[in-house]
Amino acid sequence: MPKFRQTSEIIKLMAKKQDIRDVGIIAHIDHGKTTMTDSLLAEAGLLSPKIAGEARALDYLEEEQKRGITIKTANISLLHEIEGTPYVVNLIDTPGHVDFTGKVTRALRAIDGVVVVVDAVEEVMVQTETVTKQALEERVRPVLFINKVDRLIGELKLNSDQVQSKLLRVIRDFNNLIDLYGEQEHKEKWRVDPAKGTVAFGSALHRWGFTVDLAQQKGIKFSDVVEAYQKERWQELQKTIPLHDAILSMVVKNLPNPVEAQKYRVPKIWKGELESEIGQAMLKCDENGPTVICLTSAQMDPHAGLVATGRTFSGSIREGDRIYLVGAKKDYRVQQVSMYMGAFREVVDRIAAGNISALLGLDL
């Protein structure tokens, strides 16, 4: 789908909070979250499919490209349609390296759900546990993508039964993290289960993936995937079970919209009085209430200056609005409001509660 068509449609849909998903991607380093994101961008028409997985489109800082890791939080708004209904998925690609867990925590404040990416060969690692624990502490709901299934077949030479056995162990270990760190009222519902569509399997590098329900719709079995690699026909999987469909459908169907999420997240992440006008507006994700934005990051643009990224929890933000920065204890005039499209920003007139925005004019 071409970029500009998507941008215009996304702007219209931003007002429909029930059709918004604010989600992040978290993982142990090198488990493939940025490669997965590149595949999603390729489908959106923002990246050539030929270089998806190699371009590192959200790693737009020179240091990130050079070191091959994601350091600062990057953002993209994607359009995904299910049964004729379009949804906006505001996607954040977060750091996976142990040195940058503070940036992960800030990013988690802005989102309501996460796709946790786990390497099928390496399985759940220390940093997987660290970032999953952080997400659960912020009341951010997880779903699971088990990546690099191709390595189980191509490198380890596992058969269909052996592949499934290894994947079930990853799911078990991941659910153990939810049991260990999840809050009592959420952990049972948030445990991932392939039968419920909260687990996807695939290869981000080869751009295919599926959930159980998607595989049933397409008539695909694990043995078909194994055979595709054994006969070197894995490219066919990109067409039959494209990765973007599995990931975005899993996100839309299982992760909460801002109205649902803020009811239980605001009491955890906001220390103000919930019965106040601001508190009630945040709990309801009310775009007509007082404007409250949680700023999660800032980076320097050589042309525009400092760009602040934030999630609007209530109210709305327009160019020319004056906002008070609690940390700086000072008013600032918003010079520009935009939405993210990878390394680029699309200027918009207004961004309402429940959405992620980029703001110019704030001196953080």
Give, region by region, the residue ranges found by the protein language model:
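Structural and coupling elements of P-loop NTPases
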Residues: 1-364
